[in-house]
UniProtKB/Swiss-Prot annotation:
Upper lineage: Bacteria, Bacillati, Cyanobacteriota, Cyanophyceae, Synechococcales
UniProt protein name: Holliday junction branch migration complex subunit RuvB
GO biological process terms, semicolon-separated: DNA recombination; DNA repair
Uppermost EC category: hydrolase
Positions with a binding annotation for ATP: 40-41, 82, 85-87, 191, 201, 238
Organism (species): Prochlorococcus marinus (strain MIT 9303)
GO molecular function, one term: ATP binding
Amino acid sequence: MAIVSSSAGRADSQPPAAKSRVVDASPLPEEASPAREDGLRPKRLEDYIGQRELKQVLGIAVKAAMGRGDALDHVLLYGPPGLGKTTMAMVLAEELGVKCRVTSAPALERPRDIVGLLVNLQPREVLFIDEIHRLTRVAEELLYPAMEDRRLDLTVGKGSTARTRALELPPFTLVGATTRAGALSSPLRDRFGLIQRLEFYGLEDLQAIVERAAGLLRLQLTAQACQEIARRCRGTPRIANRLLRRVRDVASVCGGESLIDAALVDEALTLHRVDARGLDASDRRLLDLLLESHGGGPVGLETLAAALGEDPATLEAVVEPFLLQLGFLQRTPRGRVVTGAGRRHLGWPELP
């Protein structure tokens, strides 16, 4: 039960924002809108490339719900940013033949914000909440009966005049997306019937995504050019599409070539300082500092952050994860260490 007149702050604090990077998986300001002008988002499950197990599970759930004439069960999608959680929510709505109402947890700071969304839902509609781990406690309490019993419990008034009012809600589907599934409270997480993780994409799927996006942008790329973009996008479709747009910019300025080849892709992405493995200037600065000034480590996080002029939380949350994923960096009790693979990539000899 929740009090309508209550207000509360945001549920958690976020790490300081890093400088804008072309290989950042988080959406840039111009990419924040779910509906972009270039229309690169797939609209149906059959157009959604990759995530085969996820598509199979959700496809069966959609067909079953439509067969019953009921709303799809509530869905929680989690995983790293840029893998298609928002897109999947919109695809589910399209498959169900209903609207998808899109919002994010920080926009639902006041109880009346989420109440307004819930009472205006039409039968079987999809409500998508991004960053759902950032919901306030009051917003979560409003969602509990809404998700479980399709009912909104409101307390109107204060003190001795307070009274409880229950509003019946139509059947609806809540799709929550988060990069931090562990930050969700257990009561909220337990109310989702389908909890699915999105994985990083393989090279073959990424190449298919680049080919599809190139067609929608009316670009002609060789297979090698598509593969070159796929190699550098960190397993993330959002980054792949962003790199493709940067390649388009260079191609149009360099004479508007009708066919974009791998050499032009390399030229364009080298201009943006993205190397053959997807590392950018920030990644290489960290590795270079460790190698040139500290013999490859170990070096503490605070020391690295001070030397690089970065916030420690930003360094740990934004720069390091991809280096760890590639096996170029290792976290040890004594600090950060460049691995043999990291040394080879930067052209340094391995330690004996």
